[in-house]
């Protein structure tokens, strides 16, 4: 009775999405994820950092490649509207 129900959380989430928009929330999530990765890298020992850096470079390259592939689709949709 005193707690927050799932419906109240959904309504709050909907209001936040309407206020800020999905693009701003997506960029905020990306920034938060980068901060968490940086914190994890700072907390791991140096020898593990080297292998983690290599993995991150691979992930970053794959992510940027996927973003480049999706980029023309969104631009063409914006031009049509």
Curated annotation (Swiss-Prot):
TM segment ranges: 1-21
Compositional bias ranges of the Basic and acidic residues kind: 47-59, 70-81
Location(s), subcellular: Cell inner membrane
One GO BP annotation of this record: protein transport by the Tat complex
Record InterPro entries: TatA/B/E (IPR003369), TatA/E (IPR006312)
Molecular-function GO terms, alphabetical: protein transmembrane transporter activity
Domain of life assignment: Bacteria
Main location: membrane
Pfam families: TatA_B_E
Stretch list, region Disordered: 34-81
Record keywords: Cell inner membrane, Cell membrane, Membrane, Protein transport, Translocation, Transmembrane, Transmembrane helix, Transport
Its membrane topology: Single-pass membrane protein
An annotated GO cellular component: TAT protein transport complex
PANTHER family: SEC-INDEPENDENT PROTEIN TRANSLOCASE PROTEIN TATA
Family, similarity comment: Belongs to the TatA/E family.
Subunit comment: The Tat system comprises two distinct complexes: a TatABC complex, containing multiple copies of TatA, TatB and TatC subunits, and a separate TatA complex, containing only TatA subunits. Substrates initially bind to the TatABC complex, which probably triggers association of the separate TatA complex to form the active translocon.
Summary of the function given for this chain in its UniProt record: Part of the twin-arginine translocation (Tat) system that transports large folded proteins containing a characteristic twin-arginine motif in their signal peptide across membranes. TatA could form the protein-conducting channel of the Tat system.
Name of this chain's protein: Sec-independent protein translocase protein TatA
